[in-house]
């Protein structure tokens, strides 16, 4: 069965379910291997366009880590990360603007066949930040302090799909790199979104990081601190889980870390309760 046939069958199967989502809002953070593989990229764009066709408001926030790292290496600089966050100096910011807000963003918009509108956190005052204050200095990494959704509301009202690069600006006009998972979460909170979806390169949150069979399919947010203390949530998973927890604690119904290596993972996260990544929720 070819990819087109598979997608057509999935569309037919999903019609009734997606009709129930009409008028609802989903924020998707797109990144990882699904941005590198041409085949996976195609299925992601198919999924996003299908949701749009059913009247579902979709906001796509993207990373671009591999492209940024490539740009850094071309400058003779080795990328550095601490706790999953990129250490960012002025040279890195320049690369982020060129690669993330430029090349990556516009190529994604092009794949959305006239339905996408390319934005970054600087545009329309969308994301205001301040320098992230931490025990370790991450450089020009921002902490989001305000989200102005005016430009997003205008785009969604025009039935467009905002495609947002994760950069932001402070009150002095200094540009910062901002974690894309955090951007997606804060935008989802500000929009009052119905669902937050974060794409990653693993099956989800694993009780044993070396065994995908140990997938934790559902996590109640009150468990998160314990899971961090146990080392189950660590490294790059920390900002992802923090983003999910933030969304849920702000009133969001469901946050979902999905396996971006699976074809049509976005659609499946809506259509199926089967083990597809890790769903975060709050016990009522």
UniProtKB/Swiss-Prot annotation:
Pfam families per record: AA_kinase
HAMAP family (UniProt xref): ArgB
Known role: Catalyzes the ATP-dependent phosphorylation of N-acetyl-L-glutamate.
Protein name: Acetylglutamate kinase
Alphabetized GO MF terms: acetylglutamate kinase activity; ATP binding
Site, as annotated: Transition state stabilizer: 29, 240
Keywords assigned by UniProt, alphabetized: Amino-acid biosynthesis, Arginine biosynthesis, ATP-binding, Cytoplasm, Kinase, Nucleotide-binding, Transferase
GO terms, biological process: arginine biosynthetic process via ornithine; L-arginine biosynthetic process
Pathway membership, UniProt: Amino-acid biosynthesis; L-arginine biosynthesis; N(2)-acetyl-L-ornithine from L-glutamate: step 2/4
UniProt EC number: 2.7.2.8
Alphabetical list of NCBIfam families matching this protein: argB (TIGR00761)
UniProt-annotated location(s): Cytoplasm
InterPro entries in alphabetical order: AceGlu_kinase-like_sf, AcgluKinase_fam, ArgB, Asp/Glu/Uridylate_kinase, Glu/AcGlu_kinase, NAGK-C
């Amino acid at each position: 069965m070819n990819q087109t046939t598979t997608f057509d069958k999935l569309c037919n199967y999903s019609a009734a379910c997606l009709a129930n989502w009409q008028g609802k809002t989903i924020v998707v953070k797109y990144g990882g291997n699904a941005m590198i593989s041409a085949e996976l990229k195609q299925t992601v764009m198919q999924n996003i366009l299908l949701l749009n066709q059913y009247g579902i408001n979709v906001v796509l926030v993207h990373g671009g880590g591999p492209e940024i790292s490539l740009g850094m290496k071309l400058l003779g600089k080795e990328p550095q990360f601490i706790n999953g966050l990129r250490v960012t100096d002025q040279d890195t910011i320049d690369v982020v603007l060129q690669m993330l807000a430029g090349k990556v963003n516009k190529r994604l918009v092009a794949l959305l066949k006239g339905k996408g509108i390319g934005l970054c956190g600087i545009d329309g005052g969308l994301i205001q930040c301040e320098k992230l204050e931490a025990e370790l200095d991450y450089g020009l990494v921002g902490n989001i302090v305000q989200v102005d959704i005016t430009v997003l509301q205008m785009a969604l009202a025009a039935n467009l799909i905002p495609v947002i690069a994760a950069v932001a600006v402070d009150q002095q006009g200094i540009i910062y790199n901002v974690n894309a998972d955090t951007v997606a979460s804060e935008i989802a909170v500000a929009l009052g979104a119905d669902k937050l979806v974060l794409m990653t390169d693993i099956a989800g949150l694993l009780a044993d990081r070396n065994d995908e069979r140990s997938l934790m399919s559902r996590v109640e947010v009150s468990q998160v601190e314990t899971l961090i203390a146990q080392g189950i949530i660590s490294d790059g998973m920390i900002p992802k889980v923090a983003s999910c927890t933030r969304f849920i604690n702000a009133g969001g119904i469901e946050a979902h870390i999905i396996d971006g290596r699976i074809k049509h993972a976005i659609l499946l996260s809506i259509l199926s309760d089967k083990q597809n990544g890790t769903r975060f929720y709050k016990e009522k």
